[in-house]
Amino acid sequence: MQNHGFNDGSYGGRRLPAAGTDEYHADQYYDDRAGHNLGPYSNSSQGQLYTADYSSERLYMQPPQSITQSPSPGPYYNHQQDHVVNPQQIHDRGEYFDGYNQGHPPQEHQAYDDDGQPLIEDQHGYSDNPQHQTQTPAGGIKRWKTVKQVLLYRGNLVLDCPVPPILLNQNPHSKERDEFTHMRYSAATCDPSDFYNENFTLRQKLFSSPRHTELFIVVTMYNEDDILFARTMIGVFKNIEYMCNRPNSKTWGKDAWKKIVVCVVSDGRAKINPRTKAILSGMGVYQEGIAKQQVNNKDVTAHIYEYSTHTHLQLKNGVVSLVHNRQPVQMLFCLKEKNQKKINSHRWFFQAFGRVLDPNICVLIDAGTRPGGNSIYHLWKAFDLEPMCGGACGEIKAMLGTGGKNLINPLVATQNFEYKMSNILDKPLESAFGFISVLPGAFSAYRYVALQNDKNGKGPLEKYFLGETLHGGSSAGLFESNMYLAEDRILCFELVTKRNCHWILQYVKSATGETDVPDTVTELVLQRRRWLNGSFFAAIYAIAHFYEFFRSDHSFFRKLAFFVEFVFNTINMIFAWFAIGNFFLVFKILTTSLGSADLLGRTGEILGVVFTWLYGVFLMTCFVLSMGNRPAGSGRLYTAMVWFWAIIMIYLMFAAIFIAVKAIIKDVNSGTAFSISQLFKNPVFYTLIISVMSTFGIWLIASIIMFDPWHMLTSFIQYMLLTPTYTNVLNVYAFCNTHDVSWGTKGDDKVEKLPSVNTKDGQGKTDLPDEGDLNAQYQREIEKFSTKFKEVKTPPTAAQLQEKQMDYYRGVRTGVVLIWMITNFALAALVLSSAGLERITPGNGNSQQEATDRSNIYMTIVLWSVAVLSGFKFLGAMWFLVVRMFRGV
């Protein structure tokens, strides 16, 4: 089959100047053979042109002759040299044009059908006289295998496949072949970086007037089920409908969908969820039985399906259903042959498809993230209003379920509070400076031109894609491997520091995206391991390479703002490094203070010793589990630790409140006139109050000012109780597993073998489904997701049984090591009379005033540091609001 793969709107390998430029001439056409412009359009005596009522815009479709059974003379056989085509003239006349034979007239006696014949015949959609083979046994679908002739252009296999008639009849379409009647399949046999140079192209460049892509949206997925995928696609479709319903917009309006391409990239043919693949089939984007394993002995690296669908999705009661006759959407589905991680999926998006389409704005969404109904528009608007905006992100929300039912789970509530405060204080502060440390890959956008490398191949994308070669490579160091676990942070840094440029990053509060959050301890531990390690090492990289800001073209004041922000980030990183030590010191000081005579006395001393011992035991347990056990195999232990640290936090909150109240009572009963000013002279009181008000008070005030205070009511308590878990469980596991640089999704690619295509002199044969098979296959795919999913329990495999046995061995090993460590610690404490035993055993009981003074000084420094950092965040958030009032987005 002839290839559609011309370069970026070119024909025959040469670029056709765009309309509206000085180079463009409506009556000229670039001919690759002659290397010069040809004269005005002249009609062929044999070629009949179609007239369509649906649209005046004609797509250069793969000609019908490319899939007949008869021998083909090849794409260049006996063509007249004086035949030329004027695409613009055909576009204006609303006539159908065969864009794959441009510059070459139909032969007088062709061995294949001419372009005047309808593609979809009465019986079969591929040829007049298909060859039938033996029918499949009863019980399966009664398929007829049809052998079809295909032509290749420069070694590339491209097929225009009719969509199932049962789908076609439910949606509006032209009477002739167009983007709604045919799905286009391309078998890519190259690396993403070679896609353009190998003469592959996409449909948007094959229209009589190539379509400009303003928005290029990518949805990356691994093995997400039909519910997660539908949730994302429903949000994307709503955004496209919103932009099509903006008649007064200069950019958008009725035909806005023609400026938007939605790309779905699935990471591995063996990994894609069959129900998700069935949804794509139901939309007409995917067809089973079309893909090939090899083309001329070259392995296929990606299967690319293109279709403009009228079929949208809806989700009710956990079941996905199709909704036909809706706003058209240009879909591009890339099914990678192998599982090569998300960063490789982005290579296909940016290096392969992005180079062909040359979009303005690229939007990145993870499957499972549901963008708000107009969120993508608001992201685009940020770029439209600020020419130097190189990247933007919206607010990531935790999915709370109907009526917030998911908040019953304290883990979900804690993450909800964490996300909210990050979007209220952290992101606005960074946006005010112009540099956001990370644009979440789950929902963010970039200006395509800002990401491009320079002429030497150096730039943001070069650094970003370096992570693909580092992972699993023997030359990669531990620092670089961990750093590229958060490769989106590297991309943000390289974008803002791009040489001789002055791009900035922005936070768009109006754009929201909802995503599922881990609802079990083990899932949370595994997720945060990659987040914490990646962000920590990426932050070190950014601080160490701060000088690269000076190679950019930012103004002096912008660079000064970046310097202030990096000082702030450095202080935060230092506190994060010492978080586990700081928490223990605060715990020790508060529990020891409760043992004083004017507070709890002897009871406080005993409680302090008991909690100190338990603290040590559970912290050691965290270390032992983190260094040897899989979280999935130690779920109960991790859950027990969450409960213990919550109890510790309750005790600390009681201690802080009790000490502050006692200080007030002591001042009231001192015999002097009580006043507020006198109260603040009490160092214990004002240190605690300043710290608490600077943290909790600022959280509340900022949330109210942002008109988003509800998380303070629904999630604040849960967040406070689980704060020690973040410090003593998640941080410990992350640092104990810095050697683990995996993403947790890499697996064996054992997948069904596909047929291959071999050609001679540009032609070959392949098996393709006929029309009856298309309908039966389409019905079968629809049935896959038309009912609620019922999990089929399968007996454990040998590998699973072995893994379970290994979990048991690890559990025994953990118990032995824990007993050994605890008994040795108890022996040392008894011999040395330390760990608080000296306070509850008979003795002098002399206090160490010097140690007490040091503790008070330490507490003062820590609490005032918290106050200053919180106040700085608050000021940044307020400045963001002021700027947002004038900017409008």
From Swiss-Prot:
InterPro entries according to UniProt: Chitin_synth (IPR004835), Chitin_synth_fun (IPR004834), Chitin_synth_N (IPR013616)
Compartmental location: Cell membrane
Region Disordered, annotated ranges: 94-138
Top-rank EC class of the record's enzyme: transferase
Consequences of knocking out this gene: Leads to delayed conidial germination.
EC number of this enzyme: 2.4.1.16
Keywords from the named record: Cell membrane, Cell wall biogenesis/degradation, Glycoprotein, Glycosyltransferase, Membrane, Transferase, Transmembrane, Transmembrane helix
GO molecular function term, any single one: chitin synthase activity
GO cellular-component term (any): plasma membrane
Glycosylation site list: 43, 199
UniProt-listed Pfam families: Chitin_synth_1, Chitin_synth_1N
Transmembrane segments: 431-451, 530-550, 560-580, 606-626, 641-661, 687-707, 716-736, 815-835, 861-881
Catalytic activity field: [(1->4)-N-acetyl-beta-D-glucosaminyl](n) + UDP-N-acetyl-alpha-D-glucosamine = [(1->4)-N-acetyl-beta-D-glucosaminyl](n+1) + UDP + H(+)
GO BP terms, alphabetized: ascospore wall assembly; chitin biosynthetic process; septum digestion after cytokinesis
Tissue: Expressed in hyphal bodies.
Membrane topology: Multi-pass membrane protein
Chief location of this protein within or outside the cell: membrane
Family: Belongs to the chitin synthase family. Class I subfamily.
Protein purpose: Polymerizes chitin, a structural polymer of the cell wall and septum, by transferring the sugar moiety of UDP-GlcNAc to the non-reducing end of the growing chitin polymer. Contributes to the production of conidia and the ability of fungal conidia to germinate. Not involved in fungal stress tolerances.
Protein name from the UniProt record: Chitin synthase I
